[in-house]
Structure formats: C-alpha cells, structure tokens
From Swiss-Prot:
Annotated Gene Ontology cellular component terms: extracellular region
Residues in G8 domain copies: 266-392
Naturally occurring in which organism (per UniProt): Dictyostelium discoideum (Social amoeba)
Keyword check for Secreted: yes
Pfam family, one: G8
PbH1 repeats: 522-544, 545-567, 621-642
Stated family: Belongs to the comF family.
Highest taxon of the lineage: Eukaryota
Signal peptide span: 1-23
Keywords: Glycoprotein, Repeat, Secreted, Signal
InterPro entries, alphabetized: CEMIP_beta-hel_dom, G8_domain, G8_domain-comF-like
Name by which UniProt lists this protein: Protein rliB
Gene: rliB
Glycosites: 136, 195, 279, 318, 547, 605, 728, 845, 1030, 1044, 1091, 1107
Compartments in which it is found: Secreted
Higher taxonomy: Eukaryota, Amoebozoa, Evosea, Eumycetozoa, Dictyostelia
Length: 1117
C-alpha cells in the first residue's frame, strides 16, 4: 500500500512539474508571444576541391536473366542479401553455354577515355563437374532498343570488354577490371555475358554474385569554363522577377494586440481548453493564436471549425499539428504576403478512405476546406528561384552541379534534377538529391548523381527545390489507398512557400492537393512558390474560378493531370513560371490509331477519363495567360482538350470552351513526352471531352477533333471572326511530335525544337515561323535509332506555311529503307489515294545547317497513292531547294515538268523542281456519273485514266494516273488533257476547287467527230448564280486559251475549255498569307457542267463515247 501511495505521489509531483513548465513556457498573458523562428539558413560547408569516387551498385532487384533455348526465366535470378547486393542465379540442367545478366535501368553515362572500374565478388554454389568451367565474362553496353533482339539476331554493342578470372571457387573471389569507352555513351544498357566452356549437362547448378558495381573515378572539382547564361539561342523564355517578395515584419499577424491564446481557458466559453478528441469551434468574434505549446503535437485533432467572424492565427514557431478536418468560414492565417513565416510547421492530415463529408457537406474529408466568404493565408519562407536550369551538363558520378540563376536554397534540402531522357515514364532518370553544401550557383549533394543530365546551349534540365519549411501532408497510411489530405478553397486564398506531399485522393473529384473550387472571380488569391510531391491526384486545380494566379510553383511525381483547369469555364487566370515533372497517367496510357486515338469512359477507377492522357498542364479553356512554364514528362506536357460544352458543375452553362483561342501562351517549354501514342506531342491541342447525355458520365477520346477558334469564343462561319491559336517563343525537346495541333487555325511563332521526331504537327490554317529545328545534339538522344524529320506536310485540305526556319543536323540514317524512314528536313505524307493534296504547303526563308543535299526532302513513291502522285509545295524564294527563285516542287511523275528549260528531276528526293515564274499549283475535281462519284471512297488502284500536259512545246507524254477517287493537282496556266480508259462521258462536272485569280487550266477532252456541247457554270452557293455563265463557241483552241473562260472549242478531236474562277479578285482574303508566302484558298464551289451529244455516235449504256484514240493536242497551243 505504501509503495502504491508513493507512486501516486510521484505522478502528482510530475503533473505539477509539467503544469509549471507549461505555465512558464506558454503564458496566458495577452502580450506574450513565442520567439519567432529565424530566417537564417544553416551554415554550408565549403565546396570540396576533389569529387570522391562513386559507385553504381547492382543488386538482384536491379538485374534480370536472359538465355537461349527458351531458358529465359526471371525467377532464375534472385536477391539473397540487400546489404551486400548479393544475388544468386539458378541454372537448370541443359542450360546453354552462356547467359546474360541485364540491368533493368540505364547504365551510367560514360565519358570517353575515362578509366572506370567494374567489380564484383563471385562464387560457385557447387563444384562443377564434367570439365565445365566458367571460362570468361564480357561486359557490354548496348542500345536499349536492341536488348529484346539479342537472343535472336546480332546486335553490335556500343562497347564490350571480355575478361578472365578465378571463377572456379565455392568461396567468394573478387574481380575488378578497368575499362575505358572510346566515345561518350549517354544512354545504354549494361549486360554481363557469362560464358561457360560448354553447355551444361544434367546437373542443376547455382552461382552467386555480390558487390557488383561500376566505380566512377574521383576527379578535381573545377568549375566548367563556359557555363550557360542564356537558356535559348533564338527565342526568349521569360523568367520570374529576380527579387524576393518585400517583407514588413511589423505587420506580422501574430503581433496583433487583440489576439487571445488557444491555450488560455478564458478563450473558450466553458473556460476549458478543448481536447483533441473533441469537435472544436473557435469562439465567435475571436482571433485565436496557436503557439507550439498551445496544443498536443502528437494527438490527432478531430475537427476544427473557424466561424465567419473568427480567425485562427498561427505563431511563427516550429509546430506539428495532427488533424483530420478543418473548416474555414472565417480566416485561417499562417503568415501573410508581407510576413512570411520562417518556422518549420507541419500539418498532418489523418483519416481513412471514405466518401462521407466529414469536413462539411460537399467538402469531403481529411483536409482543409475554405467556404465562400472564408479566407486562408499560408506563407512560408521564400526560396527563390523555386526552380532553375543546369548551367552545364552533369555526368554519372558527379556530385556538384552548376545552375543558371541565383538561389537561396539550404543545406539539407532536397533538389530535383529532371530527366534528359525521351521516355520519361519508361526509363525514369529524374533524380532527387540532398544538398550537402552550396556556394552561389554551385550545389554539392550528399550522394553522387546517377544519370546524365544535359545542360548544353540547346536546352538544359530543370533543377527544382522540393523542400519548404511549411508542410501540409497526408499521414503515413495515405499510401495504402492513395488517399491523402486535400485543401479546397471556395473563398479567397493566398498560398506561398508551402510543400504539399502525399496529398490528393485518387479518383475522388474535388479532392486535390491545392484546389480553388467554384470560387468564381477571385480578387486577391494566388498560389506562389509552393511544391507538390508524391501526389495521389493532381497538383494545383482551378475549378470554376477566374482571375487566379499560379506562379513559381513546382510539382513532381504526380498522378493524373497536374495543373488542372477543370470544367472549361475557367478564364483570365495566370499560370506563370511553374514546373511540372514526372506526371503519370491513371491506368494504362492512351494510345490507339494515328488519328482516331482511343476512347475512355468515366468509371470508379478513372473518374476523369482524360487522365488516361495525363500531363503537366491541362487547359480546358485556352483563354488564360500561360507564361514561362515548363513541363517535363507526362503523356503530354500541355494539353488543350476540345470541349463543345463545359462539364461537371458547369455542364449547363452556355459556352463553347473549344472556341476560345489562347489569351497568352508565351515562353513555355515541354520535353520528354508525347511518346506513348504515335500522334502524341508535348504540347497537344486535340482530344475531345464530353458528357454523355444518356448516362451523364464523362467520355474522352484522345484523337483528332476540330477546334474552331473564333472571336469571343462564339463559333461562326464568318471568316471575319476567325482567330488563330497563338504559341509564342516555345521550346520542345526530346519529344515525339513537339507541338501537335488538330485545330482549324494556329500560329507558332518563335520555336526551338531539339532531339524530337518532329517539331510540330499542325493542321488547319497553320503558320510556323522564326524557328530552329535541330535533329540531334544530346548524347542520350544520339544513341536512339529515331527517324527524325523537320516537318511533314499533310495530304489534304489544310494550309501550311513554314517561314524563317533554320534546320540543323539531319544526319542520314544508313538503315532507312524509305525516305520517310530517314532523318530528313521535309517529309511527304504519301499513304492514301482518298486524301490527296491540293496546293496546301509553302516555304520561305529557310536555312540549312549541317545537312547533306540528299536529306532535304523525303518523298516515298507509292504507285497506288494520289497523295504520292500529287505531293507538292511552293518554295517562294528557293531557299529550301537551293534555286534561290520562287520554285514549284512536285512529285516523282513527269506530270509536274511543264517546261524542260525550267524543270529538273532530283533523284535523291524523287521529285521535280521547277521555276515558278507566272505559274502556280491548282486543283480540280472531275465528277463523272457511273465512274467518279463525289465523296465516294475507292481503292487506290481503281485507275480509270490519266491527265496529261499538252501545249507549250510539249511533244512527249507527261501524265499522271487518275482513279475513281476524285481530285487532280498540278501546275496551272498549262494544258491538261483528260483521258478516261472507258471513253469520254456524255456529262461531267468540273469543280474549279483551286484555280487562283489570273490562273487557269486549259482543259482538253477527246470526243468523236460531230459531237456538240452545252457548257455552263454554276456558282453553287451564290445568290442567283452570281458569276455563272453559259459558254459560247469560239473559232479556235487558241481563242479559248486567250479568253476569260466563257469560250469553248471542238476541233473534231478534242473539246477545249478554259477552267477559271471568275468570282475571284485577287484579294488577300482569297489566300492564306504569312511571312511573305501564300497559299490559295479552295473555293466552295464553282462548277463547270459539260454536256455532250453526238447525232452520229451513240454512247454506251453507261453514257460514255468509246473507241477514241489517245492523242495529245498540238504542242503549239
């Protein structure tokens, strides 16, 4: 009993001591404040003078096994010990005489002529019998794309080294070799080939490895001599202000004299400080200050409500709060614009996955919600710049990097270096490292850098700070269900200098890390220099909110679209100087056909089906200011989906989001994306998102959809309202198709594109100007077997002008079979007979650097393809093809050679090159009953005749085939003779689709003697057939050719008609004009009707005069 009483007494004394300490450290006096945290950074050690040697270690989880004879079994290689990276390889009986140990991840980048070491410990599991020995091993580095073929066909390694050693012991023996590669190896896969003296017999055996590693040698630390100071050669990428936000510590909110302490019982109506397990409501009309000693920093607070007349203000002192829910109807203050906090404040959100709204109705659970009329202000210490770029290239094993911009980062903080690899999601080479020391723009890390990160003059990997002093995070259990915390603001909110990690709730709408939700037009809200890491669902969301600013933020390792404009009504927001990196699709990434894409439907595992194509910036309404942002990775870096109507909460709003053009898109960068779909791009204007009218669920298709951008976002057929989506000063690199635009109108002015399949794929009325397009530079990129082109001209009904562009480094690919497999500047799209090019492409002021003449144009000859036969463009100054005069470029057929003195055939390009002179390129369509039916689709080999040049001194046959698919393109102001194998028709229509002002087609058609004609024209969509006429008989073919198109003539062999379009006046509105080049419009529709009758000769039952002879009209016409 006495012992029990003593224990009680000791507990009581301890309780009094605790109370006394709390009273001393957390007074209730209204003037008392805890000491504010210091803004001082930890002292940095000096940078070293020597970079230590570093090891890249390979354990069992980093490797897999390959062998011949269908003996490849991943289970053959198993980890034994993580401590020493020990692994075993079980070799079954009858195993082949060698096998391969293959690294799962890319090898370190290796510098030429540097001595590296490869080492390991090796032992046998059993003594080998029957004279079998491990004779030698070969260390090799292969192109990653070759690995899958090694067992079936020869692939030359990029480097290999065979060595011998003691491989016969059942106890570990160490082996070290020194090797040096003759050329830089940026991207490769390490393979160790283990060779036996002969194949195994009937015994199962085991071998063991441990401590396998590549050692990068030590080296002196010397600052590179030519650090990058300008991140682009041609364009201007704007940057955030170099200065820190101004501070006035006299305004700090914790200094206000009317504050009451949370820990003071008198603050509360019942004179009791609330306990964590209670639902806590801040007293009405009070401004309550939380200090570290005010609350338990380990217990979990259930729910805190801040009423409309109340405020909850945090002291600037180190604090941890564990909480489930916070509802802000009044004000939540943790620093302000002029008083950024320096404390380490950690808010940890707790709660299991649920659909119950525990914060408040519609606000979900496990987070902070700010209702309409509420206000939240969270401001941590400003670290600036929040992200920058490398100032020099970083190699595997380096520990020090140099960056371009001034930074005030601190020792112990974490830093991201983004990938310099194309396929970001497949081969993750993003690296997160910890700062060991820092001096100016030089940063030393605690561990060596594993991968190569490019920092050349063309482009540079981004370097971002991932640490902040204020952290909002989900609890450790959040990983189990991808159900983290979330911050939702329906009022006004100001966030700066905070980190949000393990936030967002996967596939739960409106539960994102940081989210402005139906806040309408905000007046003083922003998100600045924050960072989101390891997000389960998005990063920063703007939903039903206008006039919000997101600037200088970072996001890394994010599931689903990251910077996310949700419903399509979000306008007049500003996204500036933000970085998104390593963004993941939800589920398998979207793929599908080249233009059709794939369709996804809303379901519980994909509540926003567009997340199948998740990217860094998702812009459902383009009318926003988007400046100086960068997107690394993702399905696309920037996505502009097409929405005919808003979705979600705004599905009944009368608006067409897709009709809005870009308000400002200036100085943005995207890389390492677009590769997951054949038509994918790093900046993607395409895809379609709708609400199914029957089910009410979202449906997303990734593919080609029109985007009719017009004034004020109001769709119209009136061309005076047309607006072009404009992309200024844009950079893409390590991309598939760079900037992809399926829409109706686009201008890309100021573009740098490097190491990409193509810089852009532009549809509609498109202008690409003031650009550098560089085929290859980064050694990671050089090691890939990509077939790159400077631009591919489309095959029908678009208009594309390329002006003021420098193309560089398109190096011949010796393995290419066809021109369009090669690295060439201009590539033709030649696969179809249904889709044939009119005059739709032009170039002007083109510069070529380090490009052989053979690599300038690639045109694949496809006999059954009209898009091959009619490929053409006009080089308005001859700068691309080297003629230095306006030049018509036409396909391989002599049909394009209108004059021997002005046309030459280029065998490398398989095209004709002709001086333009007064000629142009035009297009007409013949519509013939029972033969060529408008809109009908037929096979490419459905040949029905030909069209041939005549007159102007032409005596030989210069023709091209025509098929049952309508459409012929050729050089205008020349003679064209139509020949149909089945005879000439009693009736046909000729649509003068593209016969420009002052141009014509002198048409000849053979008919039997005695044929008479009635010929008229129809301006189909004009009032009372304006400009239509009836043709009259001329006295000669020459008179027809010199006429205004109202004459025809029949010489008893050929009918002659001059095809013109009298509607045209030469107005600039009749063509697409940009950069000094033009493309004539297609006119819908001016049609010639030709009726033929013959009293002496009867047509066949299909209406054709047969038994005609193929004879060209006179060459003197």
């Amino acid at each position: 009993m006495k012992n029990i009483n003593n224990k009680i007494l000791k507990i009581f004394i301890l309780f009094l001591a605790i109370c006394s300490v709390k009273s001393d450290t957390c007074p209730t006096d209204s003037n008392w404040r805890p000491t504010p945290a210091s803004s001082n950074s930890p002292v940095s050690p000096a940078l070293p003078t020597t970079s230590l040697a570093s090891d890249i270690v390979y354990g069992g989880n980093d490797l897999y096994y390959m062998a011949y004879w269908s003996m490849t079994d991943p289970n053959n290689l198993q980890p034994v010990s993580d401590v020493e990276s020990e692994f075993s390889i079980a070799l079954p009986a009858w195993a082949p005489d060698y096998f391969l140990i293959v690294a799962k991840q890319s090898a370190p980048a290796l510098k030429a002529n540097t001595n590296y070491q490869f080492s390991f410990d090796f032992k046998l599991g059993q003594v080998l019998t029957q004279g079998i020995t491990y004779s030698n091993m070969t260390l090799s580095f292969y192109k990653p794309g070759d690995i899958d073929y090694l067992l079936w066909s020869y692939r030359a390694p990029m480097y290999s080294f065979t060595f011998t050693g003691d491989f016969s012991s059942t106890t570990y023996k160490s082996k070290t070799i020194t090797f040096s590669v003759p050329v830089d190896l940026g991207l490769s896969t390490l393979i160790l080939q283990v060779n036996r003296s002969r194949a195994m017999d009937y015994d199962d055996t085991t071998i063991f490895y441990k401590n396998m590693k590549i050692t990068v040698p030590s080296k002196p630390v010397v600052a590179p001599p030519n650090l990058i100071t300008k991140d682009s050669e041609l364009i201007n990428i704007p940057k955030a202000s170099v200065s820190l936000d101004p501070q006035d510590l006299s305004t700090c909110p914790y200094l206000a004299s009317d504050l009451v302490h949370w820990h003071n019982p008198s603050t509360w109506s019942n004179n009791l400080v609330p306990q964590p397990n209670e639902n806590i409501t801040i007293p009405a009309g009070k401004r309550v200050l939380i200090s570290p000693c005010s609350i338990s920093q380990t217990a979990i607070y259930q729910r805190i409500v801040i009423p409309a007349t109340s405020e909850l203000i945090f002291a600037d002192s180190n604090l941890t709060m564990n909480v489930k829910d916070i509802l802000v109807q009044g004000k939540f203050i943790m620093g302000t614009t002029k008083c950024r906090y320096n404390a380490n404040i950690n808010i940890i959100f707790h709660g299991s996955k649920t659909k119950v709204d525990t914060i408040a109705p519609f606000y979900g659970s496990k987070g902070i919600a700010v209702s309409a009329g509420g206000f939240i202000s969270v401001h941590g210490k400003q670290y600036h710049n929040s992200w920058t770029k490398l100032a020099s290239t970083v190699w595997s094993g380096d520990r020090i990097i140099y960056v371009q911009d001034n930074i005030n980062w601190e020792v112990g903080q974490q830093v991201l270096i983004t990938t310099s690899q194309f396929k970001d999601e497949i081969d993750n080479q993003n690296e997160v490292l910890t700062i060991k020391s820092i001096l100016g723009k030089a940063i030393e890390f605690t561990t060596p850098i594993k991968f190569y990160h490019y920092g050349g003059k063309e482009y540079q990997a981004e370097v971002a700070l991932l640490s902040r002093r204020i952290i909002f995070q989900g609890n450790d259990e959040s990983d189990q269900d991808s159900f983290g915390g979330h911050v939702l603001v329906s009022g006004e909110g100001q966030f700066a200098g905070i980190q949000l990690k393990k936030m967002g709730q996967r596939n739960v709408k409106a539960r994102y890390p940081l989210h402005f939700h139906l806040a309408n037009v905000v007046q003083k809200s922003y998100i600045s220099d924050c960072v989101v890491t390891k997000s389960y669902y998005r990063c920063y969301t703007i939903h039903g909110t206008n006039n919000l600013t997101l600037t200088r933020n970072v996001a890394f390792d994010v599931n689903g679209h990251c910077y996310y404009l949700e419903d399509g009504v979000e306008m007049d927001n500003t996204l500036s100087y933000n970085l998104a990196a390593f963004v993941h699709t939800i589920g398998e990434p979207a793929a599908g056909g080249a233009q059709t894409g794939e369709t996804y439907y809303e379901n519980e595992n994909l509540t926003q089906p567009a997340d199948s194509a998740a990217g860094g910036f998702y812009i459902t309404n383009a009318y926003n200011t988007i400046i100086g942002n960068s997107a690394s990775g993702g399905w696309a870096g920037f996505s502009f989906p097409n929405l005919e109507k808003p979705i979600g909460n705004h599905k009944n709003v009368e608006m067409e989001p897709q009709a809005f053009t870009t308000k400002v898109f200036e100085g943005n960068t995207a890389h390492s994306s677009g590769y997951q779909w054949i038509s994918g791009s790093s900046i993607y204007v395409g895809g379609k998102l709708i609400t199914d009218e029957v089910t009410g669920l979202l449906v997303y298709n990734t593919g080609r959809h029109s985007r009719p951008t017009c004034k004020d976002g109001i769709f119209s057929y009136d061309s005076s309202t047309y607006l072009w989506m404009r992309f200024n000063n844009t950079k893409v690199y390590l991309s598939n198709l760079g900037l992809g635009h399926w829409g109706d109108r686009v201008e890309v002015v100021g573009l740098e594109a490097y190491d990409s399949m193509r810089p852009a794929s532009l549809f509609g009325a498109a202008w690409l100007s003031n650009a550098i397009v560089d085929g290859t530079g980064n050694i990671l990129s050089k090691s890939q077997s990509y077939n790159r082109q400077g631009f591919q001209f489309y095959d029908t009904y678009v208009t594309t002008i390329l002006s003021h562009i420098t193309f560089r480094n398109f190096i011949q690919n010796p393995t290419s079979v066809y021109p369009d497999d090669d690295n060439v500047v201009i590539i033709a799209l030649t696969f179809s007979d249904l889709y044939k090019p009119q005059f739709i492409s032009s170039t002007i002021n083109i510069t070529l650097e380090n490009i052989l003449p053979a690599q300038i144009i690639g045109h694949k000859i496809v006999p059954d393809s009209g898009s091959s036969r009619f490929f053409n463009f006009i080089d308005w100054d001859g700068s691309l093809v080297g003629t230095h005069v306006p030049t018509i470029v036409g396909s391989h057929e002599k049909w394009w050679s209108y004059d021997d003195s002005k046309c030459t055939y280029n065998n490398d390009w398989t095209i004709w090159v002709c001086q333009k002179g007064s000629k142009s390129v035009g297009n007409i369509e013949f519509w013939v009953p029972n033969l060529i039916i408008r809109g009908e689709q037929n096979e490419g080999d459905s040949f029905v005749g030909s069209v041939s040049l005549f007159g102007d001194g032409i005596t030989d046959v210069r023709k091209t085939a025509i098929t049952r698919n309508a459409g012929i393109t050729g050089i205008t102001s020349t003679g064209w003779m139509l020949w149909l194998d089945g005879g000439s028709p009693t009736y046909l229509q000729v649509w003068a689709a593209q016969v420009a002002y002052q141009q014509y087609i002198f048409l000849a058609i053979p008919y039997p003697p005695g044929t008479t004609f009635t010929i008229s024209t129809e301006n189909k969509w004009a009032w009372q057939n304006a400009y239509g006429f009836n043709c009259t008989l001329a006295s000669s073919a020459a008179e027809v050719r010199s006429s205004n198109g109202t004459k025809y003539y029949f010489d008893q062999t050929h009918l002659f008609v001059k095809i013109v379009n009298p509607v045209l006046t030469g107005s600039p509105a009749e063509s697409f004009n940009r950069g000094g080049a033009k493309i004539d419009d297609v006119y819908w529709e001016y049609i010639y009707h030709i009726n033929a009758t013959n009293p002496n000769v009867s047509p066949n039952q299909d209406g054709f005069y047969t038994n005609l002879s193929y004879t060209l009209p006179s060459s003197t016409l």
